Amino acid sequence: MRRLHVALAVDDLDATIHDYSERLGPEPVAVVVGKYALWRTPEVNLSVNCDVAAGERLRHLGFEDDAVSTKSESRDVNGLLWESFSPHWQDEGINRVYGPIS
């Protein structure tokens, strides 16, 4: 399966989890309290990290792809960062960067 990935930075993670769960339907599949939330729907992989200093912004775009074994990054013609990665790679990265998923 291949899903569009959108990564956002927000300054209020709890409010974002509530709002985006209503918008997307399901609750996040992964939450690191106070730091990170991840939703996986058939259409989108949406990750949100709490970064008060950065405020609300687009961090990067990409694709979650079951057929990919490693992470790759590139920039498009507008300078936006795009990533390609497997769900397994992302799950390991969440634990490494943000801590255990609750």
Regions found by a protein language model. Give the residues of each.
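Core segments of cupin and vicinal oxygen chelate
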Residues: 1, 7-46
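Vicinal oxygen chelate
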Residues: 3-11, 37-42, 51-102
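Short acidic, gly/pro-rich beta-turn/loop elements at beta-sheet edges
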Residues: 17-18, 49, 71, 94
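Short, isolated positions in well-ordered beta-strands
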Residues: 46-47, 82
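A short local loop/turn or secondary-structure capping micro-motif enriched for an aromatic residue
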Residues: 47, 54-58, 89-93
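Short alpha-helix boundary/capping motifs
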Residues: 48-49, 102
